[in-house]
Regions:
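Short, well-ordered coil/turn segments that N-cap beta-strands
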Residues: 11-16, 42-45, 66-70, 97-101, ...
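Active-site mouth loops of central-metabolism enzymes
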Residues: 17-29, 73-85, 109-111
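Short catalytic-loop micro-motif centered on adjacent basic/acidic residues
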Residues: 44-49, 73-74, 134-137, 157-160, ...
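Conserved, mostly hydrophobic/aromatic
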Residues: 6, 18, 46, 59, ...
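Glycine/proline-rich, positively charged
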Residues: 79-193
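Structured C-terminal cap/extension of enzyme domains
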Residues: 39, 43-44, 172-186, 190-340
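N-terminal binding-site loop/beta-alpha segment at the start of enzyme catalytic domains
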Residues: 1-70
Length: 340
């Protein structure tokens, strides 16, 4: 096992964490079994959110009798102090705990600070004083907000998208967290499903100092990969380095990460999949994306109004309408080829 001290919190965390967003999609019985297997296999860090429908409920069902074995993180997307307290009390009740180790502001458009009109940070300070949360943290998809959070000295950790496709700016955030005594939680370690080899991703993450990836898991086979890394370690072999370099050549640049912050689309387009369809066609079995259901979803791109809604919401500054049109054109060409 590879355990690290998490920033300046005093918490000791297994280097591989469990991202609890995907357990929304399975039954409570299946989720509890999966969470118990993860914990028994050495994973002790579990990250969920108020926004993840019944994820907190399933985590609470799994760990209410073994709270001292895990480090628990959740999130609030509240915009006001009143909303903060409502979310916190709901999370405590649903998670069946009287405290949360790492309580995170969930992708705010700004960096909450003491004395702010929103009252969010002051509410968090009061919750910490009351013992309901141990550490105040933040998640984000925006480089500017993430950097401001690091520079502020107000946060115990930052959660940010980070994989072996990361560029210099993301790597600078990791280094900034390290020098400021903050933990760094890596979300989207598989780049939103674009990376296919979990062992290669885990091997690369293992070499990143002060980084705790949270792997989004909903199947036992997925969990087994990461438990294997914990048991045996994951060596960054020449073969895996070759895989990383190939993926970097193919995927770095202007591509949709599938985060979904542009949704819902006023024209009903499933942007977080349609805007990266060309990549999915080439990195997963293509036939799964060429069904009548997906053809109908791609046809919906024809209804794009170029209203700018998606561009204004995109944390990566992408020209989403252009991406949609490029993916639309490519999709029908691939479909036509498949029918020959």
């Amino acid at each position: 096992m590879q355990k690290i001290e998490f920033g300046s919190t005093g918490l000791v965390i297994e280097k591989n964490g469990f991202g609890c967003l995907p357990i929304q999609r399975i039954s409570e019985t299946e989720a509890v079994k999966l969470l118990h297997k993860a914990c028994d296999g050495g994973i002790n860090f579990f990250d969920t959110a108020r926004a993840y429908s019944d994820s907190e409920q399933k985590v609470g069902a799994a760990f209410s009798g073994m709270r001292d074995r895990i480090v628990l993180a959740t999130k609030t997307g509240a915009q006001t102090a009143e909303g903060f307290w409502r979310d916190l009390e709901t999370s405590l009740r649903t998670l069946k705990t009287d405290y949360i180790d790492i309580y995170q502001f969930h992708n705010p458009a700004f960096c909450p600070k003491p004395g702010g009109e929103d009252g969010l940070y002051d509410a968090a300070l009061e919750a910490k004083k009351q013992g309901k949360i141990r550490h105040i943290s933040i998640t984000n998809h925006r480089l500017a907000v993430a950097q401001e959070a690091i520079d502020s000295g107000l946060y115990a950790s930052l959660q940010f998208p980070f994989s072996y496709l990361a560029g210099e700016q993301e790597l600078a955030l990791v280094e900034g967290c390290r020098t400021h005594g903050m933990g760094f939680i890596a979300m989207k370690g598989m780049a939103g499903g674009l990376l296919r080899d979990g062992l290669t991703a885990a091997a690369w993450m293992a070499a990143q100092e002060n980084v705790v990836p949270i792997w989004g898991v909903q199947r036992e086979s997925e969990l087994d990969q990461f438990l294997q890394c914990i048991r045996e370690g994951a060596e960054l072999t020449d073969e895996r380095r070759t895989t990383i370099e190939r993926d970097r050549r193919e995927l770095c640049g202007e591509f949709c990460r599938g985060c979904g912050y542009c949704m819902p689309c006023p024209a009903g387009i499933e942007i977080n999949q349609c805007a990266r369809m060309s990549l999915m066609l080439r990195r997963a079995p293509a036939q799964a994306w060429l069904t009548e259901e997906w053809q109908a979803k791609m046809h919906q791109i024809e209804q794009c109004r170029h209203c700018g809604h998606c561009m204004a919401k995109c944390p990566y500054g992408l020209n989403t309408p252009e991406l949609l049109q490029a993916n639309y054109k490519d999709y029908w060409e691939v479909l036509a080829q498949s029918r020959k």
